[in-house]
Amino acid sequence: MRKKIASILLIFTLIIGLVGCEKKIDTGSISGFDDNEEYISMWVHTIENTPEGEAYKKSVELFNKKYDGKYFLDIEFIPRNESGGGYSDKINAGVMSGDLPDIITVDGPNISAYVSNNIIQPLDGVSDEDKSAYLDSIIEQGTIDNKLYALGAMESSVGLFYNKDIVEKAGIEIPSMDNPWTWDEFYEVCEKVKNIIPEKDYPIDMTFPSGETTIYYYAPFIWSNGGDFVSKDGLTVDGYFNSVKTYETVNYFKKLLDNKMFSKTKIDNLFELGRSAFKFDGAWLPNNIKNSYPDFNLGIAPYPVGNNWNKERYTPTGSWAYAVSSNSTNVSAATEAVKWLSGIESGVILSELTGNMPSTYDAYDKLPQFKDEIYSFLKEQLIKYGHPRPKTPAYPQVSEQYQRMLEDIVLNNKDEKETIEYSIERINAKLKRYR
């Protein structure tokens, strides 16, 4: 009987403790918060005194002004460190302690993992009309099992940039976005470039670096070839990661390297210094070129596609998004804040301060840089062909293994089957807990 009473008291104590946690306001500053307002707490992944941090701060200030007397949004800046920790460590600690804020920022590819680990919950009250304001890629990125969990603070894209002077000298005609070069055609284009450049130079400036870059830049080669990384439910890699389409993609990269279409080792600024004709890079490259290489004659071409491309979406997308944590008890208010922070006005502010691409259609119309030839192309590519990265709770492992696979097989000539099957084993080791 004593044990039973003790157990009941323990449970009661835990419940009281949890209730206390729910009511506790302990994030950020509460300056400007009135008792009659509904308090909304938020963590973001950067520091305040950066262009991105300033954009978030300004959007929060505008939200609080618009909803004065109803809501108060309180932002706390928790920067990531070079290894990606810091912010992630804070999130993990918050999960363990039950002390997450109402809103957190989530890198787009990790949304599925956050859902599977019950870190975030579905948004509340986002209508079809609300959704129609966002790019399809934003809604697809944030939707898991037909429920919308996140809305993007921004979007992103990668372009196949080219040196107009070299391309013109080689007699190459750039295809339209809807009729890109196939792999075979792109190889022939690279041969033409190789015939007119010095032997120490290369047609393409590309590498397979560790980190997120490799899957971000080169997943389109898998998708446009009819392949994929995981099943639709994100829980199966066997038959996908090791499919015939994957082997074909790897061998295409090997063909490019073996015929010296790109360098086995990274050469800094190869493209920028006029020593290659093509480079896969993010939407930040044009501005970098303009500032550091003002005489560079820059163009942009569509991503090459598999020889049997079926016109499906395939180009890179994805960036940071806002989500409501599973700890939040005021989901409706938090969702209103998420809609504001990811909306048109906030998107314009973020793009003006950082150069990032907005997540809503109308924001582009308010930004003059997207009338520029290159930025307009990136926008249209994103709208027409943008494809989110693999949606799986084991996304970090999928990303890591894709990079390792390309490095080991293409650059280091390791056995294809052994390398790919090892990758399957590593990803499956993570997926077991979710099946």
How would you describe each model-predicted region?
Residues 114-119, 138-176, 207-234, 316-324, ...:
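Periplasmic solute-binding protein
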Residues 187-192, 227, 233-264, 303:
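Glycine-centered hinge/linker elements that transmit conformational signals in sensory
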Residues 111-115, 283-296:
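A ligand-binding cleft/hinge motif common to bilobed small-molecule-binding domains
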Residues 6-7, 18-113, 128-131, 266, ...:
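Conserved N-terminal structural module of periplasmic/extracytoplasmic solute-binding proteins
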Residues 106-159, 168, 184-189, 202, ...:
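Hinge/lid segment of periplasmic solute-binding proteins
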Residues 102-105, 277-281:
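Paired acidic/hydrophobic, glycine-rich loop segments that form the ligand-binding mouth/hinge
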Residues 141-142, 294, 301, 351-404, ...:
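Long, aromatic- and glycine/proline-rich binding clefts that accommodate carbohydrate-like moieties
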Residues 65, 69, 77, 170, ...:
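Extracytoplasmic/periplasmic substrate-recognition and gating elements
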